Each structure stands twice: as C-alpha cells, then as structure tokens.
Amino acid sequence: MLSPKRTRFRKHHRGRMKGISYRGNHICFGRYALQALEPAWITSRQIEAGRRAMTRNARRGGKIWVRIFPDKPITVRPTETRMGSGKGSPEYWVAVVKPGRILYEMSGVPENIARKAIAIAASKMPIRTQFIISG
C-alpha cells in the first residue's frame, strides 16, 4: 500500500474540502481515465484495491497510472479512552480528493475493456466517479 517514506510532521489537521480540483484534472498519460465527482478522503487501501481491480481486468497489455497519492496521516484514538491526553496515533494514510480530480489513467487496451476495468475500480471508491476519454 502507498504511504510517504518520510514526512515533516507526524500528525495533520483535518482540514476541509471545499471547491473543485484545479490540479490533476486533465488526462496526462493515458487515453482513458476515472474522474472524481465528489470530495472525499480516499485511503491507501481503497487506492490499492482499485489499482488491483484494473490490473486484473486489463490482463496483459495496457498501462495504468495512479494519479493520487495518500500523503495525509489520519489519527485514531484507542477504543474506550477518555477525552483529553492529546491526539491519537497515526493509523492510516489518505489522499484528499476534490471534484474533478483524475484518480486513474489507462491506455493500451480497447475502449470496451477499459470501460469495464475502470467501472470495477470505480465500485471500490467511496465516491461517485465518471469515465472520461482524452481528446
């Protein structure tokens, strides 16, 4: 699963996801892509599940690019712990995704196979997405 090798700070603020994505919203590498339509935190496990689903469906041939990276640590407090005594310890990593962001790109396969593979990857995502074609 994806996670940063090292970070400047162990814990982040939660932040908020307002507006649309101005970066990473055009197809750069492949011919087909999966684009987010809603804001969300996408975990490294979800990213990996989508990538695996696409790879399995594309079989031989075809190249896949993952355009998001989980660089935000999410902390979780132990269960049945009283309030106070600081923030919890980092548990997993998420990518902050805003509407318009490209999640995956794909090329080297026919459109019908790409549609099928990307549809399966989309079902692994916690948000509504759309299939787009470059050009």
UniProtKB/Swiss-Prot annotation:
The keyword Ribosomal protein applies. PROSITE patterns: RIBOSOMAL_L16_1 (PS00586), RIBOSOMAL_L16_2 (PS00701). Pfam families: Ribosomal_L16. Keywords: Chloroplast, Plastid, Ribonucleoprotein, Ribosomal protein. It is found in: Plastid, Chloroplast. One of its GO terms (cellular component) is chloroplast. GO terms for molecular function: rRNA binding; structural constituent of ribosome. One of its GO terms (biological process) is mitochondrial translation. Part of the 50S ribosomal subunit. HAMAP family: Ribosomal_uL16. Belongs to the universal ribosomal protein uL16 family. NCBIfam families: rplP_bact. This is Large ribosomal subunit protein uL16c. The lineage of its organism: Eukaryota, Viridiplantae, Streptophyta, Embryophyta, Tracheophyta.
